[in-house]
Amino acid sequence: MPQHDQLHRYLFENFAVRGELVTVSETLQQILDNHNYPQPVKTVLAELLVATSLLTATLKFAGDITVQLQGDGPLSLAVINGNNQQQMRGVARVQGDIPDNADLKTLVGNGYLVITITPEEGERYQGVVGLEGDTLAACLEDYFLRSEQLPTRLFIRTGDVDGKPAAGGMLLQVMPAQNAQAEDFDHLAMLTETIKSEELLTLPANDVLWRLYHEEEVTLYDPQNVEFKCTCSRERCAGALKTLPDEEVDSILAEEGEIDMHCDYCGNHYLFNAMDIAEIRNNASPADPQVH
């Protein structure tokens, strides 16, 4: 059995092409545990999680990537946020009924894919592409074609392992400033496309690479762990409250007695009473009662 929740990078010795392989199980489960999503939405979040992990691994700097689907369908929003340390979180918003056999276009409707790259230092970049492909992988390949100009292929698989949801994926990309032959890249993509869900989700990474590329010379690097981690905090909530008009905050306090800030990603609640709000307005740091 493979070690899930790990990302592996690999290089082809004889081609200017690099690859990534990721499998997720526990990270996915933690994202899904906080909500009661229909199965098709769980599948979309699993695919988004895999895609975001693969994309963050392409970053050459410290920062994060947010990959989100938005549309006018019953799945109005699905988003995964991850950073270069492979710390992930995600959430979806569902409006209306979703049939069990709903595909991506049925779920999202008329929509688009938004990819936001936020370096810790430097300018933020955002790319938007319409959902013209039938799969998330196809839409992401369209994004790469339009933005990076680097030939890129993604292969995403979802399923169950020991009764728990799992997902995996592989990314192939021509190395920047390298002259990879188109036929070489296409050859490697054809090999990678043969990967089955069962193989990707149940075999160790080196076995997967052997099955796909046993006639090629491939270097597999040490893996990087993938984990669920939310970036919410009481301080961030206090900062958000500080931006609201005093009248609006006071009205909620008068009606409710306290303000309950809820994080959609992890389910944490942060409670603020009148004394906390007074401290926030005085630029003090309020006490830290946090409800899970």
UniProtKB/Swiss-Prot annotation:
Listed GO biological process terms: protein refolding
Disulfide pattern: C230-C232, C263-C266
Subcellular location: Cytoplasm
A GO CC annotation given for this chain: cytoplasm
Pfam family, one: HSP33
Keyword entries, A-Z: Chaperone, Cytoplasm, Disulfide bond, Redox-active center, Zinc
Processing and modification events after translation: Under oxidizing conditions two disulfide bonds are formed involving the reactive cysteines. Under reducing conditions zinc is bound to the reactive cysteines and the protein is inactive.
UniProt cross-references to InterPro entries, sorted A to Z: Heat_shock_Hsp33, Heat_shock_Hsp33_C, Heat_shock_Hsp33_N, Hsp33_helix_hairpin_bin_dom_sf
SUPFAM superfamilies from the UniProt entry: Hsp33 domain, HSP33 redox switch-like
GO molecular function: protein folding chaperone; unfolded protein binding
Stated role: Redox regulated molecular chaperone. Protects both thermally unfolding and oxidatively damaged proteins from irreversible aggregation. Plays an important role in the bacterial defense system toward oxidative stress.
Protein family per UniProt: Belongs to the HSP33 family.
NCBIfam families reported in the protein's UniProt record: PRK00114.1 (NF001033)
Protein name, as recorded: 33 kDa chaperonin
Species in which this protein is naturally found: Salmonella typhimurium (strain LT2 / SGSC1412 / ATCC 700720)
